[in-house]
């Protein structure tokens, strides 16, 4: 309907029941007034002023609105609602223009707010289908700047400033609110298209009809000024729901990325990328606007944040997402033996999968073991809705969870599972890790803990943060704590040369800032350090032990032998002597990590480097004098039956808290995935 150079301009002005002017639309208040005037660009003639009052759903006007507009709520009772008012507008414009073949018009407003922040958001909430003419418009402020580059900046420009620049007389205050603005805009437009300016209105602003999904490469350069973070989203919301919340603003292709937590579930946050900084700034004005009954917080974010969530480099994912305008559904809880044919049969003919087998993407670990997740493409919304109705239906003996998904979620899940092990395990031969004389006393408080570090902090940043106390750090005494993904957790432990220096460092450096973040510093001992790494808490109020340090009761059928209990040497090397019941005195010349051993942290997300040890294994050659430790094969087999289908390794290990199990062959899969086997030695250990 809109040509590049329209024949007519329709000047449009809206009024809401709340804030107006520069804050128009920022408070989610409804439209109560529409004013418009038609301008013939060819004849340079201005039509009559038209006005329609609109009845909002909530007939409450703010005091500011009453004072500025002089509109009373009683006068709105008989007014039409927004949908009928828009129909009157469309019909009136069509009759006045007598639109025929080749006749075109375009809306013109004072700034972006009337279209992007008022009409589109409210119409979206009320499920009103806006006419096509509302998807393109001219921003008179921008057009004025193109014609008169020497005028004020766009943000400072308004109708009165433009009128003053052109030398217009100020309108009488007898004009009702909005009428003087519409009259002035008509005069400004006629002046711009006349001598000496002879300006032509072309290339109007566009409003996206719908959100387009797509992929984003990790190598892509993204402007930080186009990204926002939305918080408080309903867990079942999709990228389409986010696009609807920001209706009227143009989101970049594939620019809505839902964030997942450590368990792969949505955490109520999303990162959104807009086409420009202007649209990002308008999005920030929707802070605490509502999605259903929930208010959504909107904050600035960075391009790096967006790439961490939405970026990907997998060719397999790119090929899977190459089909545009597809609806993505995520399957969770699949049997590990599930095939593409079984998935196709699960959905059936009512919701055919796009491309058959090519429309199914199974998620696997780096060694190609299935995770139980898959993504499926559907050609239209109808097929996707039919598919979602199969939520929690059975495939084989397992019920399948179905969720609407996004391209960014596909990237996140694939990135999470396809990453190689981030904490590499040591390989043969057995190597000495730490000479015994350098193991620090566990009760001496010669360590400090740094909490709240920036995730990008390096050892050099920590040394600079400690200042004069950096000279008191022991060799290899800085230990960065990582989370399960191998990324910095914001914590660090540092071994000082003496308890006095550790005390002074904690006193003087506590809550100093590092890269705009304040960092907490606590004095602690090596034993307290281990407590924290196993899930305890350490602050200035003292130390709270982790769950594994709470008193453990012996099994009722077990009695301790009279002699001292002995556990395997390789297992004993992993624990402090004070943690073992009746430990036998062990005097190894060095501490070892046996070949193939796996270290499990049952109660915490940390993967620490042991006190005094290097930050990675394998840098130190094996001593020729060190002999291999013989394997300890005694043990008992326990069969677990009736496990929940979603039970994982962590739940099984927590169930056996207090027992020492053999980590290298601890879990053995069986045919029934709700069962597992655990082997552990006969010794009873409180860990």
UniProtKB/Swiss-Prot annotation:
Swiss-Prot/TrEMBL keywords: mRNA processing, mRNA splicing, Nucleus, Repeat, RNA-binding
Q: Which GO terms describe its cellular component?
A: nucleus
Look up keyword Repeat and say if it applies: yes
Q: Which residues form the RRM domain?
A: 226-303, 327-407, 446-526
Record carries keyword Repeat: yes
Q: Which GO terms describe its biological process?
A: mRNA processing; regulation of RNA splicing; RNA splicing
Subcellular location(s) of the protein: Nucleus
MF terms (GO), sorted A to Z = mRNA binding
Per the record, the domain of life is: Eukaryota
> Which CDD domains did the record assign?
RRM1_ESRP1, RRM2_ESRP1, RRM3_ESRP1_ESRP2
Q: Record's InterPro entries?
A: ESRP (IPR050666), ESRP1_RRM1 (IPR034427), Nucleotide-bd_a/b_plait_sf (IPR012677), RBD_domain_sf (IPR035979), RNaseH-like_sf (IPR012337), RNaseH_sf (IPR036397), RRM_dom (IPR000504)
Describe the task this protein carries out: mRNA splicing factor that regulates the formation of epithelial cell-specific isoforms. Specifically regulates the expression of FGFR2-IIIb, an epithelial cell-specific isoform of fgfr2. Acts by directly binding specific sequences in mRNAs. Binds the GU-rich sequence motifs in the ISE/ISS-3, a cis-element regulatory region present in the mRNA of fgfr2.
Protein family according to the UniProt entry: Belongs to the ESRP family.
Task: Tell me the protein's name.
Answer: Epithelial splicing regulatory protein 1
| Source organism of this protein record | Xenopus tropicalis
Q: What is the lineage of its organism?
A: Eukaryota, Metazoa, Chordata, Craniata, Vertebrata
């Amino acid at each position: 309907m809109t040509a590049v150079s329209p024949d007519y301009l329709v000047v449009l002005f809206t009024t809401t029941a709340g804030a107006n002017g520069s804050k128009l639309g920022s408070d989610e208040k409804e439209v109560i007034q529409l004013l418009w005037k038609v301008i013939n660009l060819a004849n340079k003639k201005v039509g009559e002023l038209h006005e329609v009052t609109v009845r909002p759903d909530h007939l409450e006007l703010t005091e500011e609105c009453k004072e500025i507009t002089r509109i009373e709520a009683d006068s709105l009772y008989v007014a039409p609602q927004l949908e009928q008012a828009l129909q009157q507008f469309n019909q009136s414009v069509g009759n006045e223009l007598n639109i025929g073949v080749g006749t075109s018009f375009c809306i013109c407003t004072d700034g972006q707010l009337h279209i992007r922040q008022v009409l589109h958001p409210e119409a979206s909430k009320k499920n009103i289908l806006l006419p096509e003419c509302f998807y393109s418009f001219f921003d008179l402020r921008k057009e004025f700047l193109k014609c008169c580059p020497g005028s004020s900046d766009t943000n400072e420009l308004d109708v009165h400033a433009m009128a003053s620049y052109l030398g217009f007389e100020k309108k009488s205050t007898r004009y009702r609110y909005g009428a003087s603005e519409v009259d002035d805009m008509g005069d400004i437009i006629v002046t711009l298209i006349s001598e000496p300016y002879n300006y032509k209105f072309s290339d109007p602003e566009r409003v996206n009809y719908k959100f387009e999904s797509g992929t984003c490469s990790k190598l892509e350069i993204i402007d930080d000024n186009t990204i926002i973070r939305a918080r408080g989203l309903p867990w079942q919301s999709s990228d389409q729901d986010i696009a609807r919340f920001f209706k009227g603003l143009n989101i970049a292709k594939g620019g809505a990325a839902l964030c997942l937590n450590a368990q792969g579930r949505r955490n109520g946050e999303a990162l959104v990328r807009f086409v420009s900084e202007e649209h990002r700034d308008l999005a920030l004005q929707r802070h605490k606007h509502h999605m259903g009954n929930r208010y959504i917080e909107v904050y600035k974010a960075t391009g790096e944040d967006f790439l961490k969530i939405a970026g990907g480099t997998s060719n397999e994912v790119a090929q899977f997402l190459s089909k545009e305008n597809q609806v993505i559904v995520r399957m969770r809880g699949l049997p590990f033996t599930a095939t593409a044919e079984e998935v196709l049969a699960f959905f059936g003919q009512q919701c055919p999968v796009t491309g058959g087998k090519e429309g199914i993407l199974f998620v696997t670990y780096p060694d190609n073991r299935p995770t139980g997740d898959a993504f499926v493409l559907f050609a239209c919304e109808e097929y996707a809705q039919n598919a979602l109705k199969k939520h929690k239906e059975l495939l084989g003996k397992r019920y399948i969870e179905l969720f609407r998904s996004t391209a960014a979620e596909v990237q996140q899940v694939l990135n999470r599972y396809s990453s190689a092990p981030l904490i590499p395990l040591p390989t043969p031969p057995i190597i000495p890790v730490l000479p015994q004389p350098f193991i620090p006393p566990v009760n001496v408080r010669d360590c400090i803990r740094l909490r709240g570090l920036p995730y990008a902090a390096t050892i050099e940043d920590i040394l600079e943060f400690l200042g004069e106390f950096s000279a008191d750090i022991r060799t290899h005494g800085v230990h960065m704590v990582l989370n399960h993904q191998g990324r910095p957790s914001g914590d660090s432990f540092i071994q000082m040369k003496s308890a006095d220096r550790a005390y002074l460092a904690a006193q003087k450096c506590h809550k100093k800032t590092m890269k705009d973040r304040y960092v907490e510093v606590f004095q602690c001992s090596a034993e307290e350090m281990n407590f924290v790494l196993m899930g305890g808490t350490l602050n200035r109020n003292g130390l709270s032990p982790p769950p594994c340090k709470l008193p453990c009761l012996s099994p009722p059928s077990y009695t301790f032998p009279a002699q001292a209990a002995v556990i395997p040497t390789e297992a004993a090397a992993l624990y402090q002597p004070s943690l073992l019941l009746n430990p036998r005195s062990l005097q190894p010349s060095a501490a070892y990590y046996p070949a193939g051993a796996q270290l499990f942290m049952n109660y915490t997300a940390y993967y620490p480097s042991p006190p005094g040890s290097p930050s990675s294994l394998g840098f130190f050659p094996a001593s020729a004098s060190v002999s291999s430790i013989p394997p300890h094969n005694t043990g008992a087999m326990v069969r677990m039956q009736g496990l929940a289908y979603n039970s994982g390794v962590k739940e099984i290990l927590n169930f056996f808290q207090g027992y020492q199990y053999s980590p290298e062959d601890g879990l053995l899969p069986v045919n029934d995935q709700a069962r597992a086997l655990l082997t552990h030695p006969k010794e009873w250990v409180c860990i």
